[in-house]
Amino acid sequence: MIPGSLGLGLLDRLRSWGLGAPEHIDAIFAEIRRQRGGVISYNDMVAETTRRFAAAIRGIPTSTVAEVAAEVWSGRRGALFPFVRPMVEMIRARGLRPVIVSSSPREIVRCLAAELGVGDAAGSIFGVEDGVYTGTCELMPGRPQGKMAALRRLLGVDALAGAVDLAGSMALGNALSDACVLEVVGTPIAFEPVPELRALAISRGWMISDRARLLDDLDDVLA
C-alpha cells in the first residue's frame, strides 16, 4: 500500500527521538540485509528481527510509541499508492469487507487503517505490562502461518473455515508470509511479489499484478 516498511520507519524515528536500544535497531537492519543478500532465510530473518524489535522497545511506554507512530504516519501518508483508496472503495462496493494484516507494529498499522476508514486491521503485537513494553512478542504476522493467526485473532474465531467465506474472499500480498492467506482464498493476487512469492504464484496459477494494472485486474476478478 505504501513504498518501504512502516515498521522500519517507526524504528528509525524512535532512534531519532533517542529511544530504543541502538544495538538491537542496528541488528534488525543488518539481518534484513543478510536475508536480501541470500545469507539467511526469510523465516530466520523474521525470527531474529522479531526478537530484536521486542528488545529494542523494551521499557518504552506504549503511549510514546503511539505518538512516534502518529508522527511517522503524518510524514508518510502522502506516499500511499494512488490505487489504494479506490481499491478499498471497490472492495466495499462489491460487498466485501476490507481487512488489513501487516507485519509492522499494530501501533502504526492502526494509523494506516484509520486513514483508509478500515475498521479491521492487525499488526505485530508486543507484550505490555503497566503501559510499558516488556521485551516480548505476542503476535508476529510475518512468521510462518502468522497472518492466518492474525486473522483468527482479529476476527475472534478459532478457524477461518466455516467462519469466513474463503472461496468468496480475495487476498492481496507481496511477501512470502502472505502465501498462507493467498492459498486459502478464492481470488489470490500476488502484488509486485518478492521473487519467492512470484515463483509460488506462477506454480499455483495465481494472478500477478502491479500498481499500474491492479485496479483493472480487480475490476475483472471482482465483477
Give the residues covered by each predicted segment:
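C-terminal cap/substrate-recognition subdomain and adjoining C-terminal extension
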Residues: 68, 74-223
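Amphipathic alpha-helical interaction elements
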Residues: 2, 37, 54-57, 110, ...
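A metal-dependent, Asp-based hydrolase signature
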Residues: 6-90, 97
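Asp-based phosphoryl-transfer active-site loop
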Residues: 1-9, 182
